[in-house]
Amino acid sequence: MHKIMAINAGSSSLKFQIFTMPGEEVLVKGLIERIGLPDAIFNMSFQNEKIKEIRAINNHGEAVEILLEQLKAHQVINDLSEITGVGHRVAHGGEDFVTSCVVTDEVVKGIEAVTNLAPLHNPANIIGIKTFRELLPNAVSVAVFDTAFHQTIPEENFLYALPYELYEKHHIRKYGFHGTSHKYVAGKAAEVLEKPLEKLKIISCHLGNGASVCAIEAGKSVNTSMGFTPNAGLMMGTRSGTIDATIIPYLVDELGYSLDEVMHMMSSESGVLGVSGISSDFRDIEIAAKEGNSRALLTLRMFTGQICNYIGAYASAMNGCDALLFTAGVGENSPLIRQMVTEQLSYLGVTCHVTKNNAGDMIISNDDEAVKVCIIPTNEELMIARDVEKYAKQTIS
């Protein structure tokens, strides 16, 4: 038995879990939020204990140091050498990283080379990788790429209708994201439905503050809604999703915005927040909608309508759908969103059992329907730990 740590570093946060492997038991988990601020929050839970501290944490490097200190101070581990592997979620791997890999100096350079494609995420991922390699030099470090699962998408689905040379020379194409989550829930759904993954046509809806839909055939991604960056596809918490590209020069040339202002608007002021004018959080939108707020209702109709557009297109492309999956914060916890989506898909044979949906059952479709509608809680950290386990076993055997 050995210990594997899974790390998910965001732009101002660091999510962590330690698993004992190969049993996949969670030893400790937690979240460090508001990194860079004087009132950063350190949360950690283990063995029925919960720790919450508010303190200054200036950067991700300091966050890692504090985390390792706390693990020892609370005797979650006695020595850092007990951690044999650390897995890092990396948002964007470009075309060079088609699977998880052991981190080397060359791998770090490769991740840095595509930082401009995920400027909010990759820099934090890199800092986490470098700090853990420095503080845990004997643990194997593994990079797990959000884009890797989508490397099976065929060329006709990942190319943009731009001059082909832009792909050949500059690798401008659809990459897709949330791959670790989509891969996990597809495998879990196969277990729940007691069917071989290789024989299933699955449409996975990862719906959180970031959101994407993925078509999965025989366990492989064949299309997904996000694109060159995580801004494409569905409208999201603060992201616009896909828009007519000529809106951008119009905003610059006719309305006087700078390009930086437009990009900030599209990534931080649009989506659910921009349309509703209320919040980027769907919980707030649902409350406002129930109170009759017209823009909150409009936001819900837009969001669920866009989801259904992708589901319909992917079901058509795969010539069917065996399972429709809802996962992530909104997908797992919003009966209203699930109901609004499934109500628009009756032509596919999709149903939603009201009682099962409201109770959050794992299978919420009617029993006799061919298309199984499932709520599958995602577990990206476990997927990361499993990938690390493959490499860590080689070093400790």
Swiss-Prot record:
Location in or out of the cell: Cytoplasm
Keyword terms, alphabetized: ATP-binding, Cytoplasm, Kinase, Magnesium, Metal-binding, Nucleotide-binding, Transferase
UniProt-annotated binding residues for Mg(2+): 8, 380
GO cellular component: cytoplasm
Domain of life: Bacteria
Matches recorded under SUPFAM superfamilies: Actin-like ATPase domain
Cofactor(s) listed: Mg(2+); Mn(2+)
Positions contributing to substrate binding: 89
Alphabetized Pfam families for the sequence: Acetate_kinase
Site feature Transition state stabilizer, where: 178, 239
The protein's annotated pathway: Metabolic intermediate biosynthesis; acetyl-CoA biosynthesis; acetyl-CoA from acetate: step 1/2
Catalysed reaction, written as an equation: acetate + ATP = acetyl phosphate + ADP
Residues noted as binding ATP in the record, renumbered to the chain: 15, 206-210, 281-283, 329-333
GO BP terms: acetate metabolic process; acetyl-CoA biosynthetic process
Keyword presence, Iron-sulfur: no
Free-text comment on the cofactor: Mg(2+). Can also accept Mn(2+).
Record-annotated active site: 146 (proton donor/acceptor)
Enzyme class: transferase
The protein's Enzyme Commission number: 2.7.2.1
GO MF annotation terms: acetate kinase activity; ATP binding; magnesium ion binding
Keyword presence, Transmembrane helix: no
Subunit structure: Homodimer.
Family that this chain belongs to: Belongs to the acetokinase family.
Protein's job: Catalyzes the formation of acetyl phosphate from acetate and ATP. Can also catalyze the reverse reaction.
Protein name: Acetate kinase 1
Organism whose genome encodes this protein: Listeria monocytogenes serotype 4b (strain F2365)
Lineage: Bacteria, Bacillati, Bacillota, Bacilli, Bacillales
